[in-house]
Amino acid sequence: MKVFAAALAVILATATFCTPASASPYASDTTPCCFAYISRPLPRAHIQEYFYTSSKCSIPAVVFVTRKKRQVCANPEKKWVREYINTLEMS
């Protein structure tokens, strides 16, 4: 039982003091990084806005923000992504 309690304490301490993997390692840059892209287009009507990830991220990405404030990473080289960006810029 003591081993279990000690292990639980270590896990909780680690979880408390570690930052999520998507957080930026640079204090002045709060843009999240993407590590994978969505495999298919989102419904255009669900997207409210977009932004590009930082150049400090390992892969370039466009992050679409849905009406429910969900952030989805997309490949900026895909045709549907460029079309969605153009549509959002026009509106």
UniProtKB/Swiss-Prot annotation:
Question: Which branch of life, at top level?
Answer: Eukaryota
Main subcellular location = secreted
Q: Could you provide one GO biological process annotation from this protein's UniProt record?
A: inflammatory response
Q: Which UniProt keywords apply?
A: Chemotaxis, Cytokine, Disulfide bond, Inflammatory response, Secreted, Signal
The signal peptide annotation in the UniProt record is: 1-23
What InterPro entries does the record point to?
Answer: Chemokine_b/g/d (IPR039809), Chemokine_CC_CS (IPR000827), Chemokine_IL8-like_dom (IPR001811), Interleukin_8-like_sf (IPR036048)
Which GO-annotated molecular functions does the record name?
CCR chemokine receptor binding; chemokine activity
Q: Name one GO cellular component term.
A: extracellular space
* UniProt keyword Signal present: yes
- Which residues form each disulfide bond in the chain? 33-57, 34-73
Compartment(s) of residence? Secreted
**Which PANTHER family would you find in this protein's record?**
C-C MOTIF CHEMOKINE 5, SMALL INDUCIBLE CYTOKINE A
Into which family does the record put it? Belongs to the intercrine beta (chemokine CC) family.
Function statement? Chemoattractant for blood monocytes, memory T-helper cells and eosinophils. Causes the release of histamine from basophils and activates eosinophils. May activate several chemokine receptors including CCR1, CCR3, CCR4 and CCR5. May also be an agonist of the G protein-coupled receptor GPR75. Together with GPR75, may play a role in neuron survival through activation of a downstream signaling pathway involving the PI3, Akt and MAP kinases. By activating GPR75 may also play a role in insulin secretion by islet cells.
Name under which the protein is recorded: C-C motif chemokine 5
Source organism: Equus caballus (Horse)
